[in-house]
Amino acid sequence: MNELRKGRQSIVFPNYPSIAASAAVAGKKEGKGPLRADFDQIAADTKLGQASWEKAESMLQKTAFELALEKASLACGDLDILFAGDLLNQCISSSFAARDTNLPFLGLYGACSTMAESLLLAASFVNAGYAKRAAALTSSHFASAERQYRFPLGYGGQRTPTAQWTVTASGCCIVSTGGKGPFIEGATIGKIQDFGIKDANNMGAAMAPAAIDTIRQHFEDFHRRPQDYDLIVTGDLGLLGKQI
């Protein structure tokens, strides 16, 4: 029996990788919301002084990455690998953010699951001894996502009632051996669940079945109940996806 597997879809990390530090950077709109106090930095300008939305998103990643390193009292060279992703073609914002780090880089494309995916992979590398310290980094930007998935803002198209608002923000966690925690003890990897959603704007409804299936499988694999957790968080399912 493989002691690193748990149930049907889960894995465990017996060496308990820890989150040494984390940082979150948000856009102006997000800075006015209920999570304002939890952001390390709030941008006053949605373009962050850059020439394009995509460059602005890359700057969000750079800022979150540098803040996380600073909070962990580490230099970039103290890391062994960088896992980063975004919502854009060729992970362009992540690639440009990683360009100046001189770190081994694995680009991820998991949509709203990218932060969880990057943490899963970082914890896997640290737990197995392939890395002593790894960074898990992701970002999104409302304007760059609109251009990628819906309509460029300059087009002036009307948003559908089912279209959620993609967050302008970036988050980074430094995952390492030892430490005081919080620790990553395991992970559950989800499956594709296609319920035939035809509305291309309603991404929340398209993702909701996979989210609930993964959460259900996590409880089953680890023999736990929802009450055992202080908080259960998903990617952005939007209002309709959350209701589902």
Kindly give the residue locations of the regions a language model identified.
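A glycine- and small-aliphatic-rich helix-loop capping segment at beta-alpha/alpha-beta transitions
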Residues: 35-38, 94-104, 126-128, 149-158
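Conserved beta-ketoacyl condensing-enzyme motif
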Residues: 19, 53-110, 228-243
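Condensing-enzyme catalytic core mediating Claisen C-C bond formation in acyl metabolism
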Residues: 1-54, 152-216, 221-224
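Short beta-strand segments
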Residues: 20, 83-85, 134-140, 175
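Active-site-proximal alpha-helical scaffold in enzymes
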Residues: 108-136, 175, 209
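Short acidic, glycine/serine/threonine-rich loops at helix termini
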Residues: 30-32, 93-95, 145-150, 243-244
